[in-house]
Amino acid sequence: MKIGIVGLPNVGKSTMFNSITKAGAECANYPFCTIEPNVGVVAVPDERIDKLAEMYNPQKVTKAVVEFVDIAGLVKGASKGEGLGNKFLSHIREVDAICQVVRCFEDSNVIHVDGNVNPLRDIETINLELIFADMETLTKRLDKAKKGLKADKKYQAEIDFIEKIKSNLEKGIPARALEYNEDEQEMLKDMFLLTAKPIIYIANISEEQIQNADNEEMVKQVKEYASKENAEVIPLCVKIEEELSGLEEQDKKEMLEALGLEESGLDKLIKKSYDLLGLMSFLTAGEPEVRAWTIKKGTKAPKAAGKIHSDIERGFIKAEIVSYDDLIREGSMVAAKEKGLVRQEGKEYIMQDGDVVLFKFNV
């Protein structure tokens, strides 16, 4: 899973990236300090892996990972190549989801590229550039489909679909906000539209606002905007997240408790990203390794096995599965088997989040 972090200059985007990856990306109080995308890989927080590691005491523990890409800042006109527009658009095409950092705090020491703080204007600045880029993509596709229609009537469905999306884009409605039937979903995948990508808005607030984040006026504005386009909002203080990222686990817990928070904003972001992309994890456990594997919800057992190795998918015989909760409750795989909680599943089995599995195969 690859998530692109975007935002106008000086909204806290690079500071947030630093928090996530502890990569120390250059961060300065002026536009375009992020010229090339910084990439960082971060483990998905998962208590189940920690518990299984305690049970098996393996040689190796591997959590699922998310790849975060800090994408260069942009300005109005990016879709026409202004600022770092062309680079921005090429980098954002490569990600699975977008995380847009939006400034929701006042601070006279941190300049704003447009002179004052207005989160909705900032959101619309970026979204408009993505809409303009998609309009260009769709115009080219439409021309091609109209030429194809002369030889084959099947192109009519594509033409109708493109015109449906275009008419909504012209009203400022992104592709992700629309409803699609199965055929349309397949066509949409083939168009690689930027506004079809799932999006999470990070409402970057000050430390003083954190106790009452959901009731802050700017946060409420962002939430109302997001609700109209199937987007998610996470209010967090990027400065606090940066502090948390440098602490040991126990110190981090104590700081979160002192702030009245149950978990860090970054953990929320990773979990929300998983949900937004329809992802989940199955687990493998043994003395050599305890590991989480990321798959799409609805994945069948052989396809999941292919995540581990293509040979296992090709020679799939069956999957020996116990739910994580059952395994932890019984205390061992042997005890779970004695209780009849370990199942033998075939090729049509749809994997569930938290399945602990051993694949049987023959090649």
Question: For the regions a protein language model found, what residue spans apply to each?
Answer:
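Generic anion/oxyanion-binding catalytic loop in active/binding sites
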Residues: I5, G24, G77, G115, ...
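Flexible interhelical turns and helix-capping residues at alpha-helix boundaries
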Residues: P9, I131-D134, F192
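Structural motif
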Residues: Q352-V357
